[in-house]
């Protein structure tokens, strides 16, 4: 099976879609999120998707998770000639397939436990961002309405922003000058999000750029923690993550 969902004996009333990082797997992501899962076990089930492309282990995976392969990534490695490679839109089509299948599988097995939000890590956080944006643009009718999201140490490429800009400008019939403010606003995601940024993360600059370019300052909360490319480890940081995420969920009435 190329995708995984939570155990069959689901008890929580709602679920979160979990999108792992590059060179990772659902089994590894379960371990990475263990503290969060324990704290939210009464509130959420965690539904894991397996990325479509086999790959080598990602940053920080070895040697800790050497026994939890194989590893998968969301985008195929570049051949070095980007001009002849697939576009972002084409690559997203490959990304959508395992996500859609996982959602259908979950909805079939657990029709009374809706998926209401998402958690993405590293490359998976970039995938989550693109999913949120596409849904906001009225696309992806198969994707459950995402009310809240947590993005952990996002990996960012300007190519993703360029894809979004091109899509928006096409919707405005190339009338860029007269509608500059309007189409710029369409690049901004407007659901409550929590962005976790490790102060020593190699991807920190890109993480900051992603939230600045594509998330509403009124809806996005940024939490920096002492750490690298990982979910926070220190108990006080974990507690802060949990408290902030719960408050976001209450804001959108995902939690009472």
From Swiss-Prot:
GO terms for biological process: lovastatin biosynthetic process; polyketide biosynthetic process. Keywords: Hydrolase. The keyword Endoplasmic reticulum does not apply. GO terms for cellular component: cytoplasm; nucleus. It comes from the Eukaryota. It catalyses: dihydromonacolin L-[lovastatin nonaketide synthase] + H2O = holo-[lovastatin nonaketide synthase] + dihydromonacolin L carboxylate + H(+). SUPFAM superfamilies: alpha/beta-Hydrolases. One of its GO terms (molecular function) is hydrolase activity, acting on ester bonds. Lovastatin acts as a hypolipidemic agent that works as inhibitor of (3S)-hydroxymethylglutaryl-coenzyme A (HMG-CoA) reductase (HMGR) which reduces HMG-CoA to mevalonate and is the key step in cholesterol biosynthesis. Lovastatin, simvastatin and related compounds are widely used to treat hypercholesteremia and reduce the risk of cardiovascular disease. Furthermore, statins such as lovastatin were found to be anticancer agents. It comes from Aspergillus terreus (strain NIH 2624 / FGSC A1156). The active site is at residues 122, 201, 229. Pathway: Polyketide biosynthesis; lovastatin biosynthesis. Pfam families: FSH1 (PF03959). Disruption phenotype: Strongly reduced lovastatin biosynthesis. Low levels of lovastatin are released due to complementation by other esterases. Its EC number is 3.1.2.31. PANTHER family: ESTERASE DBAE-RELATED (PTHR48070:SF3), ESTERASE OVCA2 (PTHR48070). This is Dihydromonacolin L-[lovastatin nonaketide synthase] thioesterase. Belongs to the LovG family. InterPro entries: AB_hydrolase_fold, FSH-like_dom, LovG. Esterase; part of the gene cluster that mediates the biosynthesis of lovastatin (also known as mevinolin, mevacor or monacolin K), a hypolipidemic inhibitor of (3S)-hydroxymethylglutaryl-coenzyme A (HMG-CoA) reductase (HMGR). The first step in the biosynthesis of lovastatin is the production of dihydromonacolin L acid by the lovastatin nonaketide synthase lovB and the trans-acting enoyl reductase lovC via condensation of one acetyl-CoA unit and 8 malonyl-CoA units. Dihydromonacolin L acid is released from lovB by the thioesterase lovG.
